């Protein structure tokens, strides 16, 4: 499924651009209520822009090609498998794409359950058995059926709102303290350059810290997507697919795409910032049936 750093980077870029426009035009709300309204509009705005552009951004990021008409047996099998599983999951047929990468990976994205995309790497088609590939596709179909992208958009919107709100409150305080010469009765945010610089830095820092929340959600939904795959094609097929991933190449997708793929990077500074749970934990969760209840 399509998810996180590309999503986060787009959100961050939108917030920084909005902040720059507001600062240059002098549109600074001195009231807490006004600032909160602005934060809500821009916070959720960035999330929904990312959601609406998600298919285009994902395909562009990996150089994916949508299959309009299957050209060979492999593409025909892929399209038929996606169609069968989409019917089983009760969703409309997603677009199907292939992208060139040596690693075993796949992702799904889209603004709605009935307007989605499933993409798989050439490495997956070449190195996985049909049963394993079927399980990976079912994992991505489950992400779509669970509505993970919409849920993530709402979570990211709330996170964005608080990042904007808190950073600008602190920026106003810093600007007023460091350069705020103002006449009596005059409303001011202090030095506008200090305000913009502090607000931008704080938005970047708080945005990174807030990503812990979205990373947690990303890991949590991976367990549920694994369980969804097990229900669609069988638990053993999904376990076999995860075991195959343990021996696969290090993913070659851009770092910004890791949260959108089934096979996220396993090496990270901390599990707090990992988009995916360790593969061993995912396999154990399937064996115990923890998320199948």
Curated annotation (Swiss-Prot):
Ranges of the Cytoplasmic topological domain: 1-3, 55-157, 214-293
Active site: 140
Residue ranges the record marks as coiled coil: none
GO biological process terms, semicolon-separated: proteolysis
GO cellular component: plasma membrane
CDD domains according to UniProt: M48B_HtpX_like
Membrane topology, as annotated: Multi-pass membrane protein
Ranges that cross the membrane: 4-24, 34-54, 158-178, 193-213
Intrachain disulfide bonds: none
Induction: More highly expressed in exponential than stationary phase, it is induced 2-fold in response to model apple juice (pH 3.5).
Enzyme class: hydrolase
Oxidoreductase listed as a keyword: no
Enzyme Commission identifier(s): 3.4.24.-
Location in or out of the cell: Cell inner membrane
Primary location class: membrane
Binding site for Zn(2+): 139, 143, 222
Protein name: Protease HtpX
Organism: Escherichia coli O157:H7
């Amino acid at each position: 499924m399509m998810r996180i750093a590309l999503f986060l980077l787009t959100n961050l870029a939108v917030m920084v651009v909005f902040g720059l426009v507001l600062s240059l035009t002098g549109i600074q709300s001195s009231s807490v209520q006004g600032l909160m309204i602005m934060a809500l509009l821009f916070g959720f705005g960035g999330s929904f822009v990312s959601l609406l552009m998600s298919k285009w951004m994902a395909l562009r990021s990996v150089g994916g090609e949508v299959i309009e008409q299957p050209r060979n047996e492999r593409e025909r099998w892929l399209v038929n498998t996606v169609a069968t599983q989409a019917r089983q999951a009760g969703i409309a047929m997603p677009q199907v794409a292939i992208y060139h990468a040596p690693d075993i990976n796949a992702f799904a994205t889209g603004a709605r359950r009935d307007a989605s995309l499933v993409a798989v790497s050439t490495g997956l088609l070449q190195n996985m058995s049909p049963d394993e590939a079927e399980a990976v596709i079912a994992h991505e179909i489950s992400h779509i059926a669970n509505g993970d992208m919409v849920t993530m958009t709402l979570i990211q919107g709330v996170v964005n709102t608080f990042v904007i709100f808190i950073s600008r409150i602190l920026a106003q305080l810093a600007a007023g303290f460091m350069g705020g010469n103002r006449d009596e009765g005059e409303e001011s945010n202090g030095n506008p350059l200090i305000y913009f610089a502090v607000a931008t830095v704080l938005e970047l820092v708080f945005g990174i810290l807030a990503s812990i929340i979205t990373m947690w959600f990303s890991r949590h939904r991976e367990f549920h997507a694994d369980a969804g795959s097990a229900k669609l094609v069988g638990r053993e097929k999904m376990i076999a697919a995860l075991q195959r991933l343990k021996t696969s190449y290090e993913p070659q997708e851009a770092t910004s795409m890791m949260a959108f793929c089934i096979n996220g990077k396993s090496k990270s500074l901390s599990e707090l910032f990992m988009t995916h749970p360790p593969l061993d934990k995912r396999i154990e969760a399937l064996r115990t049936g923890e998320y199948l209840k």
